[in-house]
């Protein structure tokens, strides 16, 4: 899976990666929180993660689209190690269970892909997961995927479009901090990238 994914990324896109040092030194599970502009986002994120973390990372995706047909659900589970989440933004028991078993979880808290390439408001799921599970959040900024593979496209545009991904330093909720208090910190960290 990963070899194929990396080959597709290398052949179809020009991907620039920043911020992996903090990620390599982080032990244990984390919630990776990224903006979401294209179906490419998951592939770019997974293909750039260090192998040790990637092997124990699952991706939360909207269940009402990807899990409505057995073909899409099987393909996404095999290619990207996915599990369903609610579009309304509530964290799932599956995500909390994965974190409890030492897995990292990718969350796109906008709830859906951007319609115009700009970041949408974040829902509370990532903050709730981090606070409830007491794990760090790794903010992730992804740029260029909307232009490389806009809505309605099934493959990246020709010409190896440029895409950038930046991993920010891990952030932890403060002791006693609520998800509502922690959420703006996450949003600001992702926007900054």
Positions of PLM-derived features:
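Generic preference for hydrophobic
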Residues: 17, 32, 59-60, 165-167
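Helix-to-loop junction immediately C-terminal to a conserved catalytic motif
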Residues: 4-36
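Catalytic core of membrane glycerolipid acyltransferases/transacylases, capturing the structured
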Residues: 25-87
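A generic structural signal for well-ordered alpha-helical segments
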Residues: 8-10, 76, 98, 130
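Non-catalytic C-terminal accessory region of glycerolipid acyltransferases
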Residues: 89-193
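Short, basic, glycine/proline-bearing loop/turn elements
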Residues: 5-6, 77-83, 109-112
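Short gly/ser/thr-rich secondary-structure transition/capping motifs
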Residues: 11-18, 86-89, 148-149
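Residue-level signal for beta-strand positions within conserved beta-sheet cores that form or flank
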Residues: 13, 55-56, 161-163
């Amino acid at each position: 899976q990963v070899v194929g994914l990396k080959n597709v990324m290398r052949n179809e896109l020009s991907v620039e990666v920043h911020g992996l040092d903090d990620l390599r030194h982080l032990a244990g599970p984390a919630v990776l929180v990224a903006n979401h502009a294209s179906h490419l986002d998951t592939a770019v994120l997974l293909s750039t993660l260090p192998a040790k973390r990637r092997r124990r990372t699952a991706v939360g995706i909207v269940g009402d689209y990807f899990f409505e047909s057995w073909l899409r659900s099987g393909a996404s589970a095999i290619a990207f190690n996915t599990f369903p989440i609610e579009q309304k933004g509530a964290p799932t028991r599956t995500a909390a269970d994965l974190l409890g078993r030492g897995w990292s979880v990718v969350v796109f808290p906008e709830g859906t892909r951007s319609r115009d390439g700009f970041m949408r408001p974040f829902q509370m799921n990532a903050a709730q997961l981090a606070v409830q599970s007491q794990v760090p959040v790794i903010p992730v900024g992804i740029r260029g995927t909307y232009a490389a593979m806009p809505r309605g496209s099934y493959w990246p545009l020709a010409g190896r479009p440029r895409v950038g991904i930046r991993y920010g330093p891990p952030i932890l909720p403060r002791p006693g901090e609520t998800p509502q208090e922690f959420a703006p910190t996450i949003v600001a960290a992702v926007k900054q990238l």
